[in-house]
Amino acid sequence: MAKTIVVKQIGSPIRRPAIQRETLKGLGLNKMNRTRELEDTPAVRGMVAKIPHLAVIIEERG
């Protein structure tokens, strides 16, 4: 089984640059306090690292 991480949106994309809004969409997040379980890859971790004020990793599984 592949390792996964749980990512939670903690900030609003309102009044944020378009690239940050697109990064949230790429992670599958669109509303406050939503969570997604995603595959643990360098690409996903890099996306979360680019927007630490909007999304955080809350759990690592596997």
From Swiss-Prot:
Keyword Ribosomal protein belongs to the record: yes
GO biological process, alphabetically ordered: translation
Annotated TM spans: none
Record keywords: Ribonucleoprotein, Ribosomal protein
InterPro entries, alphabetized: Ribo_uL30_ferredoxin-like_sf, Ribosomal_uL30_bac-type, Ribosomal_uL30_ferredoxin-like
Pfam families with a match to the protein in the record: Ribosomal_L30
Molecular function per GO: structural constituent of ribosome
GO CC terms: cytosolic large ribosomal subunit
Subunit relationships: Part of the 50S ribosomal subunit.
HAMAP family cross-referenced by the UniProt entry: Ribosomal_uL30_B
Family: Belongs to the universal ribosomal protein uL30 family.
PANTHER family: LARGE RIBOSOMAL SUBUNIT PROTEIN UL30M (PTHR15892:SF2), MITOCHONDRIAL RIBOSOMAL PROTEIN L30 (PTHR15892)
NCBIfam families recorded: rpmD_bact
Protein name: Large ribosomal subunit protein uL30
The organism's taxonomic lineage, starting at the top: Bacteria, Pseudomonadati, Pseudomonadota, Alphaproteobacteria, Rhodobacterales
Gene: rpmD
